[in-house]
């Protein structure tokens, strides 16, 4: 019997202001762990899978139950240690120390590959935490919507004079991360055709309003796209088809999309990508009997897809890798020019990272959407001169359905994170909000990740693979008083290709919380400015000087 599967489980986090734990500092991680497994949030909650192939919230159901049990008894001077989804120890620390410290999927570099990890996983000795799955701060597909939106807006500016109307994006994948592409694309003004092999995922995105229409043939999908482009009103279409088949067929037909990308779970060829010609059931059976054959077939199909992406690029499509490591998989399968199209971070996002700007997110532990709407208004009040940000918040309120506990994401940087957090804490203190707020972020942030094929691709000083930076980030956030801190390996791009850290902090309205959030939410984005300034980026150097960062090696 698989201890990770239990179809009888239906996890819903408590709402309201009544505590189940001894304080909000332990109630918050409990609720956020549970929220990760909410049926409207997780991809396969019965298997503890939150998103991203096999990204889990806990190692197995026994470990999940024990984590909840420990959090309910944990004192405010104790810290729970979680090793790859398993609660392994409780230690006396102090009130400003994290209540939970998490390490997921970390392997000594020589053994940091899928083959070794999968053996450990089968033996119950490891868990793939992805980024926010095992660090308990996943908020559903909204978590990546704004980053994807910002990328597509940048694509429109760079390639189409800022006008996306009448243009369309071809992509693959409608899972927890990929599902953001359709909504983000239409928000940016593009129509989007997204290929997905799992019909239940398309239906999930339809239900949560991330996809507008479903198609079962390429001709039907193209007709929907053409009609939308003719009308000037963008549409998103989920096409039930294999991305490799569709991308290659468009090359054959001589049809060139305006933008081409992909967000299938290509980072995990065993569990995340369906080979061409295979059914879902066939793949599930083969994963049990011949893992090597599945991996080989999946990577061969990825090679077909990437070759098609290269040909579409040559035909004029703006083509970008969206961080799932599909170029690497194709390169390993013989597509030697797989890296001829860029990753999205160096092409579009890095200037934001240089100022510590990244995916700041917060969640209303009350479960009351009004708490989020009040914080939206506070953000506008405190950042009055940013119409782009205001437009994002307006669109998010109108078009993004909350999944599980109400949440918001908004890309802000070093100048704003700490003061927003302190304002939220004050709102809790004076009763404007009905319960505390938790603030976190994706591990995809400016100072918290080393990932040479994604966030740190093509660093100007060649330091792409240096992973001291996320380790320093985790250490500093721990020292600064975050509520829980995590250190992971392999998120986004798979085993051996990334190391990254996460941070979450509670705004419970106390003076102690005000001091903690002031430290954590200044220091955390400041490490991103530090990292990019150290690599030589002038934007980061200027930001560091303007904000008074003490960087000893930064020349005047």
Curated annotation (Swiss-Prot):
Enzyme class, spelled out: lyase
Subcellular location: Cytoplasm
Database matches in HAMAP family: HutU (MF_00577)
Provenance organism: Shewanella sp. (strain ANA-3)
Keyword entries, A-Z: Cytoplasm, Histidine metabolism, Lyase, NAD
Cofactor comment text: Binds 1 NAD(+) per subunit.
Active-site positions on this chain: 410
Gene behind the chain: hutU
Listed EC numbers: 4.2.1.49
Residues annotated as binding NAD(+): 52-53, 130, 176-178, 196, 201, 242-243, 263-267, 273-274, 322, 492
InterPro entries per UniProt: Urocanase (IPR055351), Urocanase-like (IPR023637), Urocanase_C (IPR035401), Urocanase_central_sf (IPR038364), Urocanase_CS (IPR023636), Urocanase_N (IPR035400), Urocanase_Rossmann-like (IPR035085), Urocanase_sf (IPR036190)
Substrates-to-products reaction catalysed: 4-imidazolone-5-propanoate = trans-urocanate + H2O
Similarity annotation: Belongs to the urocanase family.
A GO biological process held by the record: L-histidine catabolic process to glutamate and formamide
Name of the protein: Urocanate hydratase
Alphabetical list of Gene3D superfamilies matching this protein: Urocanase like domains, Urocanase superfamily
Principal subcellular localisation of the protein: cytoplasm
